[in-house]
Curated annotation (Swiss-Prot):
Gene Ontology cellular component list: cytoplasm
Cell compartment(s), UniProt: Cytoplasm
Source organism phylogeny: Bacteria, Pseudomonadati, Pseudomonadota, Gammaproteobacteria, Enterobacterales
Organism: Klebsiella pneumoniae (strain 342)
Name by which UniProt lists this protein: 3-phosphoshikimate 1-carboxyvinyltransferase
Residues annotated as the enzyme's active site: D313 (proton acceptor)
Keyword Coiled coil: no
Length: 427
């Protein structure tokens, strides 16, 4: 297996221009495909997940052109639901941001489409979304294991009253919301249980509004969406930088700055993960906000005990930043780590112990006490981009760290390690 050893880093200082947001890129691509008119997306993320969405749209007959660096995409809208001319199988890798929204959108009208992916995708639950779509009339079959992909979709979604469980993934609700305006009837979505990752729903609602569709959001408990609508291209749309990707650089600044500045996001960002910077501030770092940047400067970091449900992806970065904080850090209400690219609670606990931390792994929380000195370790990444990026922070100690399968960052940030090296001075 390929590996990358990072030597100890004495200091980080500099500016990182963030790649486009994965969450925004894939939502914007799908809405542009469903819309009337041509949409030019700029600062689109070039990564595995986005390529899976682009390949799927192409197979569904959507016309688009990509710039040489794949960050500018001109999409010719379909002016309504996507149709496959014949039976079709779409391979979506491990891209939840493609699998969930397409599973819903392809239930409009009549299709015969199979959605499948990598082995890990077949372990990521989708039953709550399928249940909700079936309530609206969709015909969906599980081809292997009940409640998991691969799925066979044969259209039929009409709208009406549907109930969706919000406790596992906000992507299920995102998928329903984006599909509902094109259904023949109005859709009323009731949320069962606690809605996780609410800020990701805000991204969805913001993008739908950008494409001309308003949703009646009743305190995140009920969403009313009028049927028979059409998305309208906004013309040009700039994809903001990825706030989850920003977390690694901001944390590096907090631990070993200097000052690290990330551009492409700022105080007006639609992504909830920018709130990660508030957590660093709470731990003792100095944070500066601009319209198009966030900067973080080193401070004496202290442990925190916090509910992280609002920033589940960025919260992983706090788990490794906790290695540099005084005291025991507790991250709570993070059950949905277990259904991501890997079981992230198990993976994080396992690898933190390798570098010497004392870790308590609960069903939906993790408690981390750093060692006096970090130990050298080879870090397993579980084919999970965020594990690789989180554990790169171990190099901010006086101990090297080896990251196994470093190329798994291609899911969201292919040149992550180059960008980290650019702002680093080795010890």
């Amino acid at each position: 297996m390929e590996s990358l050893t990072l030597q100890p880093i004495a200091r980080v200082e500099g500016t990182v221009n963030l790649p486009g947001s994965k969450s925004v890129s894939n939502r914007a691509l799908l809405l542009a495909a469903l819309a009337r008119g041509t949409t030019v997306l700029t600062n689109l993320l070039d990564s595995d997940d986005v390529r899976h969405m682009l390949n799927a749209l192409s197979a569904l007959g959507v016309q688009y052109t990509l710039s040489a660096d794949r960050t500018r995409c001109e999409v010719t809208g379909n002016g309504g639901p996507l149709r496959a001319a014949a039976a079709l199988e779409l391979f979506l890798g491990n891209a939840g941001t493609a699998m969930r929204p397409l599973a819903a959108a392809l239930c409009l009208g009549s299709n015969d489409i199979v959605l499948t992916g990598e082995p890990r995708m077949k372990e990521r639950p989708i039953g709550h979304l399928v249940d909700a779509l079936r309530q609206g009339g969709a015909q969906i079959d599980y081809l292997e294991q009940e409640n998991y992909p691969p799925l066979r979709l044969r259209g039929g979604f009409q709208g009406g009253n549907v109930e969706v469980d919000g406790s596992v993934s906000s992507q299920f609700l995102t998928a329903l919301l984006m599909t509902a305006p094109l259904a023949p009837q109005d859709t009323v979505i009731a949320i069962k249980g606690d809605l996780v990752s609410k800020p990701y729903i805000d991204i969805t609602l913001h993008l739908m509004k950008t494409f001309g569709v308003e949703v009646d959001n009743q305190s995140y408990q009920r969403f009313v969406v009028r049927g028979k609508q059409q998305y309208q291209s906004p013309g040009d749309y700039l994809v903001e930088g990825d706030a989850s990707s920003a977390s690694y650089f901001l944390a590096a600044g907090a631990i070993k700055g200097g000052t690290v500045k990330v551009t492409g996001i700022g105080r007006g960002s639609v992504q909830g993960d920018i709130r990660f910077a508030d957590v660093l501030e709470k731990m003792g770092a100095t944070v500066t906000w601009g319209d198009d940047f966030i900067a973080c400067t080193r401070g004496e970091l202290k442990a925190i005990d916090m509910d992280m449900n609002h920033i589940p992806d960025a919260a992983m970065t706090i788990a490794t930043a906790a290695l540099f904080a005084q005291g025991t850090t507790t991250l709570r209400n993070i059950y949905n780590w277990r259904v991501k690219e890997t079981d992230r609670l198990f993976a994080m606990a396992t690898e933190l112990r390798k570098v010497g931390a004392e870790v308590e792994e609960g069903e939906d929380y993790i408690r981390i006490t750093p060692p006096a000195k970090l130990k050298y370790a080879e870090i397993g990444t579980y084919n999970d981009h965020r594990m690789a990026m989180c554990f790169s922070l171990v190099a901010l100690s006086d101990t090297p760290v080896t990251i196994l399968d470093p190329k798994c960052t291609a899911k969201t940030f292919p040149d992550y390690f180059e960008q980290l090296a650019r702002i680093s001075t080795l010890a």
